[in-house]
């Protein structure tokens, strides 16, 4: 009501959309190749109490299928950014940018460091064996890896999780 009063419109014209709904709607409506049936996935640091959502979109109707507040992929990026002595919540793009320079052999070893931190609970990505102090865990486990291989390993881990997410959803449909 306060917003409607402030901008001088009927309250029926004002709608609230949470953080992840805005992300998925933007991704859907900005896509010139959108189809009648679409899956929408959001994974980010945190917004409105969650950091992962999965949506079924059909005929411009958005149905939330699953969500999680334990999908720590963005937290891993933030901690790796800090570990690499860059500014968290600002320089994650630099970590992503270094990933292509990694050697597969070493990046695959880094993936093993992240494996087991998260798991699937149905369609939700949740914590599995995440240590209490993630930074110290990374400090111990990554100390012998080069920066580019750390970035590449984190990127591969993220891609593996997202592909698995899509496979989970496909299995859910069958």
Residue ranges and their predicted role:
Residues 1-174:
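Short acidic/glycine-rich loops and adjacent helix/strand connectors
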